[in-house]
Amino acid sequence: MSIQQRSVPLWFSSLNRCILRKVKLSFFFLTLLFLVGCSSSKFIPENEYLLQEVEIKSDQKGFDAASLEPYIRQKANSKWFSLFNIPLGTYSLSGRDTTKWVNRTLRKIGEEPVLFDTVQANQSMNDLKKALQNAGYMHADVDLQTKIKGKKLKAIYTLHLGEPYRINRVRYDIADERIKRILALDKPQHAIRSLQSGSRFTVERLDEERNRITKLLLDSGFYKFHKDFIVFEADSARNNTDINLVVRLLKYRAYSDAPETNHPRYFIRDVKFSSSEESGIHLRPKILEYNTAIKAGEPFSAAHLQATYNNFARLQAVRYTNIKFKELPDTTLLDCDIQLSHNKPHTLSFQPEGTNTAGDLGAAVSLTYENRNLFRGSEVLRVQLRGAFEAITGLEGYNDQDYQEYNAEAKLQFPRLLAPFLSSAFQRRSTASSELSFSYNLQNRPEFHRRVLSAAFRYRWNEPKRYSSYRMDLIDLNYVYMPWISDTFKRDYLDDVSSRNAILRYNYENLLVMKMGFGLRFNNGRHAMIANIETAGNILKGFSKVLSFRKNAQGQYTLFNTAYAQYVKGDFDYTRLITFDTHNSLALHIDLGLAYPYGNSKILPFEKRYFSGGANSVRGWSVRELGPGSFRGTDGRIDFINQTGDMKLDMSIEYRTKLFWKFHGAAFVDAGNIWTLRQYEEQPGGQFKLHEFYKQIAVAYGLGLRLNFDFFILRFDMGMKAINPAYETQREHFAVLHPNFGRDFTFHFAVGMPF
């Protein structure tokens, strides 16, 4: 008996796959709903209720009631993405027997039910009332309403504000004429004070004015002044919300029974340096003076004291600083003793590492020497030698199959601004450092040999009060020399006359890049910004015309028979973090970049070109897989040369939620692409055009997992293509409407901060 095997129709196989996907998706959502709906009533005692939700509202429109949420002592159980009560559902899956490992694990991962507590609710009402009174609402009241449904309770706190108290008139009662002059009460700049007529009468404003006066006096020689010497007297008429305020400075007493006197003003008599080590002080006297803001003969200043601490903290030769003041008996003079403890001047480190490049195994080793006090001025010299070796497989037609790289780098950092055209007073106030660096890199590959010589001089400085840091590259010089290229590599990649090979060939020619640049970073926890701009070749172009430099066959000016690059490039990166609660936040991100070659260059150097896709870009695509524009690589393969551009746009919105322990989840939508500024034959659809670029913006969506170890984050992202500009058919262009896991899914792993 023979058995005939029937073929299965293609439409039937596709239908089965579609049904299977829907079954898997349905199973996932059913599991999610099961965890969300898991009953926690077995952990809720009789006559008690689960605190399901807390709401805070005001009886006055425009008042930000949500800002007072920190005063609510009980919060409901956290929810994933502010929607799914998974932590409570996980805890509810556990049994009562805590000796079992599975129950302990479920309870550790989940969250114990929050039971409504009337005692904590009453304390919350009192705290809210005090907070409102401190904000000027002296007659404020708070009531609590509870809504019960089954074993669940919703708590609603309503704020009844009343009329706020406002400052009608401010009078300063200060007898000491010296302090009056310092506070400049009779001058226009006094308007910067926190207490102004018509402003709301708040504890915060009183504290601001107290701190302002205290800072001014501490910076003006009043060494023993503190905030407790400032008292406020407020007076208001009955049934009136206007406050007449008196700011009074109490007199000074040397001790409790001493008579009252004017506050003494102290001056610095002498400044000395000492060291806790037997070897003494390792810094030159000029460096000590340069970093000391405290000067003999000047009034004591808390600002100068802090500046001196900050200056010595920047010196890597110094481990810690301790500054002491000693009063001279029966005088208002101070002796200052600055005690320094030094770091070890020399360090030597050795680091081996293994490498794996696309399956090719290799090894590398680096040796680093650091001197933290080279010229006894806390100059830091860092010298690093590195060697790497890798066995390359899969190359045909080449005599050698090994990759070798050797690198030597030297950096010399000065903890001050090296600028002879600036005054010494300005340099002393500056927190900038200067850095001089040199490096030489040697690469020997089967395809080519490359040598790169680099030199740079730059400034760096910080402004902690503004959460900002800056970098200025006065000169950054790179010389790329190609001593040898194999005939096989030339024949296969460089000899073709197409534009693709023009881009590739440009990166395997001798090249000189001399650039200048400026960059800034800002981050205050809610807003983060990175901006950079650089220009290259302009100075050389000026010399080329004046000194009549030679031109090569392509019409480019050359220096030592090497063409130099000329371009301008700017980048802007901005992130906004919106925090909803301790477990949920929203991150908005945009990244813009534009680079334009001109003058002596028709093409950007390859390392200055933009690419799209990857863990820090549009996460539905792999690195360098997207763009430019609607361009698609040959046969859908990644083209590392052609899939680059002169401008980029990346946008992202990411909702982040804490899961358990150090695990965090994320749901994201990304959008962006890259474009070229010129039309290239080998990059059809890649040029930026104002009337159609928005049609070429790629969109992706997905989920991510974060493992937060405080110092670094492990990121796992699963992205799916939603809109693919490389295709015109509706099925492939709008991939979100016709998802195909094999075609659209991309996995990313990265280490670092999200962005």
What are these regions (language model features)?
Residues 39-314, 321-323, 333, 425-426, ...:
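Interaction-mediating elements
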Residues 671-688, 711, 719-737, 753-755:
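C-terminal beta-signal and adjacent terminal beta-strands/loops
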Residues 181-182, 301-528, 619-620, 626, ...:
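Gram-negative/organellar outer-membrane beta-barrel architecture
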Residues 137, 222, 345, 376-378, ...:
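Strand-connecting loop/turn motifs
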Residues 1-50, 131, 590, 751-755:
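Bacterial Sec-dependent N-terminal signal peptides
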Residues 355-358, 471-657, 667-691:
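C-terminal outer-membrane beta-barrel translocator/porin domains of Gram-negative envelope proteins
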Residues 365-371, 408-414, 438, 455-459, ...:
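Residues on the lipid-exposed face of transmembrane beta-strands in outer-membrane beta-barrel proteins
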Residues 58-60, 159-163, 174-176, 247-251, ...:
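Flexible glycine-/small-residue-rich
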